Amino acid sequence: MKEQLIATCIVFLLTLGFAGRGTCQEIPSTDYDAVKETIEQSIGWAIEKDFDAMFRLWDENMFHFWLFSDSLVVGLDSFKVYAEQWKDPDFHGTRFEFKDLRIVFSSSGDVAWYSCFLDDCGSYKGREYCLENVFQTGVLEKKNGRWIHVLMHGSYPVDKIPENYVRRFYSNLFEKKEQL
């Protein structure tokens, strides 16, 4: 009986060892800090308005979809056109914060994906505004020794859409129901 128990334990431990191979790495890799910095600079670039530095953070075949339907951008060339709006001298990034940032690496170690809640603040014509608690996700790939974004998505959970957006984009829906 003792031999069977030992054999069962050995088989179980070997099974765990093989089952763990090829899975994702939730333990920080040696690239964790580089990935985190790339994620942070994808928003933080706006404080210095360094467009060249920002564009280096993105892959040629990148995909970007932010809060509004007109923010769907595919490809770096299209992203450069989309970014023209941020060249307005009255626009400035002021501060940002990533909360609950979670980064996971692929088993090969050359792909990372993340999620967080983002506060992204800027000013326009001297008036500050903030996007708070945006649920942000993204995928980065390591190419030629550098981590770059291939996908970024930002949204609000449907139960946490800020009231000013509900009023701005959905007020007609509520007015129609009230008239019925």
Predicted features, each with a name:
Residues K142-N144, V150-L180:
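Low-complexity, intrinsically disordered terminal/linker segments enriched in charged
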Residues A19-L57, R168-L180:
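Short, low-complexity N-terminal intrinsically disordered segments enriched in polar/charged residues
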Residues F63-D77, K87-H92:
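A short gly/proline-enriched turn/hairpin at secondary-structure junctions
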Residues W58, F68, S107, C116-D120, ...:
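A mature extracytoplasmic/lumenal domain signature
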Residues S42, M54-F55, M62, G75, ...:
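Hydrophobic pocket/interface hotspot
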Residues M1-E26:
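Bacterial Sec-dependent N-terminal signal peptides
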Residues K80-E128, L180:
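Surface-exposed, charged secondary-structure patches
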